[in-house]
């Protein structure tokens, strides 16, 4: 029958989420977050997050003839990592910074003070995870100084953060080139940054259920 093939189930990679997301406490916090964020004009929302990039990351899938394996060489690296921290709004990538190794509170404060705050505006609401490295007591005054404010994302809620969709695309882009140095990561990020346009940003916001009309 026409259309039957399209309706048949296919093997797919699972989208896994923490089991904590289903607890009553976290569900309550997620609902509370939506009550707060719905009071904010989407044009003023700025979503912040970070991702880790292992040097030498490469594609894990390839194509081959049926019944044959796919072989490739994996770039050699010693477990080095680059952290990418960024922020996006409905209209633009607001700020982006990379650093070697993991993020700590001092590095995060440098990002906020030197990269993020100069790009903010009065009425901007910065949404971010409530992580120890984010050191809210030191960050909030920096935002308030330019008329911006802070809103903590509910825990276990990456599905509420549009920048996660950009991170997913960025990692797929980086895997195509398997960068083995931080400098190469920076070059590729600059290229990826040029490829982002307002349509992408609006689609990412809409995919996370933020009303953009």
Protein language model annotation of sequence segments:
Residues 1-213:
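Short functional hotspots at interaction and active-site rims
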């Amino acid at each position: 029958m026409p259309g039957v093939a399209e309706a048949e189930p296919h093997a797919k990679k699972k989208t896994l989420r923490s089991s904590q997301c289903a607890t009553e406490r976290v569900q309550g916090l997620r609902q509370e977050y939506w009550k707060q964020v719905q009071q904010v004009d989407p044009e003023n929302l700025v979503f912040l997050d970070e991702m880790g990039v292992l040097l030498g990351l490469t594609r894990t899938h390839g194509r081959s003839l049926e019944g044959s394996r796919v072989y490739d060489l994996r770039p050699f690296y010693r477990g080095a990592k680059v952290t990418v921290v960024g922020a996006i709004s409905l209209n633009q990538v607001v700020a982006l910074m990379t650093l070697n190794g993991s993020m700590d509170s001092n590095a995060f404060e440098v990002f906020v003070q030197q990269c993020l705050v100069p790009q903010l505006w009065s009425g901007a609401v910065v949404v971010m995870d409530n992580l120890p490295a984010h050191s809210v007591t030191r960050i909030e005054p920096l935002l308030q100084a330019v008329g911006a404010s802070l809103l903590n994302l509910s825990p276990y809620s990456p599905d509420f953060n549009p920048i996660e969709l950009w991170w997913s695309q960025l990692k797929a882009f980086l895997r195509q080139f398997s960068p083995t140095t931080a400098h190469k990561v920076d070059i590729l990020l600059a290229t990826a940054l040029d490829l982002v346009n307002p349509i992408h940003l609006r689609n990412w916001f809409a995919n996370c259920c933020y009303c953009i009309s």
